[in-house]
A protein has these predicted regions:
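Acyltransferase
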Residues: 44-69, 107-128
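Conserved beta-strand termini and adjacent loop/short-helix elements that scaffold enzyme active sites
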Residues: 34, 67-70, 183
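Short glycine-/acidic-enriched loop or helix-start segments at secondary-structure transitions
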Residues: 42-43, 76, 141-144
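A short helix-breaking turn/cap at a secondary-structure junction
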Residues: 1-48, 217-220
Length: 220
């Protein structure tokens, strides 16, 4: 779907009025380009596609950066996100003595950490408008019947790498409560490459708008 359709669908389905997009062009938009993550990896083809569309955005007037001292600790974010995700996914599973249930105190402790992380992200967005990252570290990979994510692996730049850590890319936005949009910006060996466009809390329409502009640049 195109960005206009995404924006319309959001307006039609949102239970509250969403703020309008802050950006109608890329001129002056402050974009943090994040091609590395301390908890996972991305193939060189993915990172090259990310840099290429970022360079085109800069030519259109965007202001690029590649780091910020205000960024939260992404390794800790991934650790706590995996904890919460595992708990959520196990709620309907049979009891497992190897993985005892978490207590209410510990769960609220995780919620406190999540809320603190969301505040840290908001401070980071004082200095940037948009963050772009890989969605996943590779293009589409061969199907596997292995049900255990921890036993799966990927080939990244010719070397075996763990599959399960790839959720660190999308986990940043999910755990931090930020809107993100996946958008195609290139291809490698005939397979599409997407990037993730992350915006501040409640700026869903801004994420959609910038994603659409980046997609148009990549297509051009």
């Amino acid at each position: 779907r195109c960005s206009d359709e995404r924006a319309l669908a959001l307006d039609l389905t949102s239970l509250i009025p969403m703020p309008r997009a802050r950006h109608s062009s890329l001129n002056g938009v402050r974009i943090l380009v994040m091609e590395d993550h301390p908890a996972t990896q991305a193939d060189s083809a993915i990172r090259a596609a990310l840099r290429a569309v970022a360079d085109k955005a800069a030519n259109a007037g965007a202001i690029l950066s590649t780091s910020s001292p205000a960024l939260p600790d992404r390794a800790l974010i991934h650790r706590d996100y995996v904890k919460m995700l595992s708990i959520a996914m196990s709620t309907r599973a049979p009891p497992d003595p190897a993985h005892p249930e978490i207590g209410v105190r510990d769960w609220f402790g995780l919620l406190d950490k999540q809320a603190d992380t969301a505040r840290q992200w908001q401070r980071a967005f004082d200095a940037v408008d948009i963050i772009i990252t890989p969605v996943f570290g590779t293009t589409a990979f061969a199907h596997t019947d292995e049900p255990d994510w921890h036993k799966r692996s990927l080939i990244i730049d010719g070397k075996e790498a763990p599959f399960v850590t790839q959720i660190a890319w999308i986990g940043m936005a999910t755990y931090g409560g930020m809107p993100s949009v996946s958008v195609p910006v290139g291809s490698h060996d005939g397979l599409p490459i997407g990037i993730q466009v992350i915006a501040p809390h409640w700026q869903d329409q801004s994420a959609i708008a910038v994603a659409g502009m980046l997609n148009a640049l990549a297509a051009g």
